[in-house]
């Protein structure tokens, strides 16, 4: 089956309305992109939990809609414009998209990732690259965290170099469960992963089972306020600052805290947020991101 892709350039305040209208009128999928992407005018657009986004769309947005080969995109675009009260119909571009083996195509884009001296993240369709490797079998797409992002790599490298076998571990904001799983594979004792997203909790349980690892994963309200030898949180700077008191309380006296998801320019303010409970210093940085660590007195 072939598909038809329709691309419409719209104003910032019209992007969401166009997306909804095209969906209502039969589009199989709709995405919104920066119309100036890959040009000097490209506009970074991102937010962070705990902060209201300053802007919800790009100044010039490109709405990309996908239709089946039996649809008439011209009729749909005209109907959407009429529904939105837009006249004349804005210009748009059409192109044919051939059907492919999308699973095979996606798999071809992911290779095993070497994270540390011995740690490898390996998709299920690949074999372990080294016989003595610490292998995490993990497929992309289940939840955030596959080892490809610098913050995940930094945390995994810290665990490889600093984890003491038998230590209890809390992975707060576990995502795919990757840090909890690698901690167990490196010899950690009781390990708990917490995430506010039920899908992440399910993905973590699935990944732990696939990797033959015993670890508990749950939503925050389902876990006791126990303290741990090691607490790891790879989130973002603003949530980390908001949770400073809570995360610090989860670290037992003499235990250690490891934080990432923090840009180099944010490290000082994150460390300041935790200063009432424990000192944090930069352990390592990569591609503008840092890993902070410290020991609770």
Swiss-Prot record:
Record key words, sorted: Cytoplasm, Methyltransferase, S-adenosyl-L-methionine, Transferase
Binding site for S-adenosyl-L-methionine: 152, 173, 195, 234
Top-level taxon of origin: Bacteria
GO cellular component: cytosol
GO molecular function: protein-lysine N-methyltransferase activity
PANTHER family given in the database record: ELECTRON TRANSFER FLAVOPROTEIN BETA SUBUNIT LYSINE METHYLTRANSFERASE
The reaction(s) this protein catalyses: L-lysyl-[protein] + 3 S-adenosyl-L-methionine = N(6),N(6),N(6)-trimethyl-L-lysyl-[protein] + 3 S-adenosyl-L-homocysteine + 3 H(+)
Protein name: Ribosomal protein L11 methyltransferase
Keyword presence, Transferase: yes
Family: Belongs to the methyltransferase superfamily. PrmA family.
UniProt GO BP: methylation
